[in-house]
Amino acid sequence: MSGASSEDSSIFARCEDVDCNKKIPVELVRMHICYAMFHRTLAARGFGTQTQAKKKPTNKKKSTTSLTDFAVFMNHFRKSFRTDYNGALVKEGSKIGWEMWKSMTEDEKKDYLDKAADEEDEDEDTVEEQADDSDDAEDNEVKETDDDN
C-alpha cells in the first residue's frame, strides 16, 4: 500500500493493485484483501475458465417413454368417443374410458398390449436408424475436415 494522505483527520492508503485502487485506513492495511489480485491469480492458474464439452445433438423427435397398453386403448377410445358422444367433455370421456378398461377381460386387454409392444419396437427401430444416420453424418464431417488439412 502506498500514497498515504490525510483525509478527515485519518490517514488512508491506496491499494497498489491497479484494478482495486481502494482507499484503506492505514490501521487496516494489513487486513485488506485485494480481490482483484486474488481473481487474477486464480485465472492465471486456470480456475474460473470453464471449457464446455461438445454435446452431441439430441433428436427432439425421439420418444422418451413408450406407450402402455392402457395409453394405446385410451388413444383408440378417444377417437371413437369423439364421434359417438359429440359435445361431451373430455373429462367424462376419460372417466368412461377408465371404467371400460377396468371392466375388460385380460384377453381383450391383450390386443392393446400387443399393439403397445409393436409401437415400442417401431420406436426403437426409428431411434436406431436416426442414431446410425447421425453417426454417418459425423463420420463424413470428420473425413471432410481431414481432407481439408
Swiss-Prot record:
Q: Where is this region: Disordered?
A: 111-149
Gene Ontology molecular function terms on file: DNA binding
GO CC terms: nucleus
User: Which SMART domains does the record cross-reference, listed alphabetically?
Assistant: HMG (SM00398)
Q: Where's DNA bound on this chain?
A: 63-131
Principal location: nucleus
Report keywords, A-Z: DNA-binding, Nucleus
Decide whether keyword Nucleus is in the record.
yes
InterPro entries under this entry? HMG_box_dom, HMG_box_dom_sf
Q: Where is the composition biased (Acidic residues)?
A: 117-149
Q: Does the keyword Mitochondrion apply?
A: no
Highest taxon above the source species: Eukaryota
Give the location in the cell: Nucleus
Note the Pfam families from the entry. Answer: HMG_box
Q: Which family does it belong to?
A: Belongs to the HMGB family.
Name of the protein in its database record: High mobility group B protein 12
Q: Which organism is it from?
A: Arabidopsis thaliana (Mouse-ear cress)
